[in-house]
Amino acid sequence: RPGHDEASDDYSLTRVPEEARRSWFSVAVQRFGQVSSFQQFMVGAVLGYGMTFTDALIAITVGSVMLEVVTILLGVAGVREGVSTSVLARWSGFGRKGSAAVGLLVAFSLAGWFGVQNGVFAQGMHDLAGWAPEWAWALLGGALVTAISVHGFTVMAWTAYLTVPAFLLLAGWSVADTLAGHSLHDLLTGPPPGPVLSLAEGTTLVAGAFILGALMTPDMTRFNRRPSDVVKQTLLGVTLGEYAIGLTAVMLGHAARTADVVGIITTSSGLWGTLILTTAILKINDWNLYSSALAAVNSADVLLGRRISRR
């Protein structure tokens, strides 16, 4: 049953049919989950450690606008054509072999980000529960994320429905606890506690931290129903993610006088820190692995002439 096979493989090499498209909210929650990640906390803390709050706000604003332009343009292409980023590259000037090269680059890059996020998870869990080595936590986290990614868009959507609100509530409580006792005026007007970052460096840091996610937007928006959905979810997801998470982390960097926001949250939160790390890794790392698999499928199809399953 070709149609069933394509659906179970999340239409890795073909257009997503209209009946398989989703509501904008379903996709928007996952996009927000990508942006409001621990990675964003880390970027914000680095900005806060090296910039004043005002300069960090400007850097986040400029970087966010750049990301939103790229995200919307590629997202609209994804919803109109209904194919993944790597397949879209075939018809966007790269050609078949060029799209295979793009696919390989993306596959390795996202696999690397998967490893980085999993490493942060393993380190944090080891610090909180030292009875197991880091490699064991990395193996457990990787296996859990892989199981979610293998089952495709539907399971990943439900994962986002559960983990995004949980992450925001838990992280919000932890941040409020950490900032308690600090003067809001001092946090907003005080000098950076560490080596100064220039505005250009801060903007590059903001844009560079999520540019790969922005480039992979068609992998997600091919499930949207109309271009306006892409605009809505981008403005909601990227803007709220960058500002709400980024600026909060800037104040954390000022308050704790360190850029190690992972250490701040996990060491001060105990069990809550464990839950924060777990929800943080689940809601973004499944997409790292998912997009990496889509890119690998396209490269195998072009270079080997074999159509392999995304799973």
Model-derived features: where do they sit?
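Selective recognition of specific alpha-helical transmembrane segments in multi-pass small-molecule
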Residues: S37-Q40, V65-V70, V106-G115, A166-A176, ...
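Transmembrane alpha-helical segments of multi-pass small-molecule transport proteins
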Residues: A100-A107, L128-H151, P165-W173, S198-L215, ...
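Juxtamembrane transmembrane-helix boundary signature
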Residues: T61-F94, A101-S109
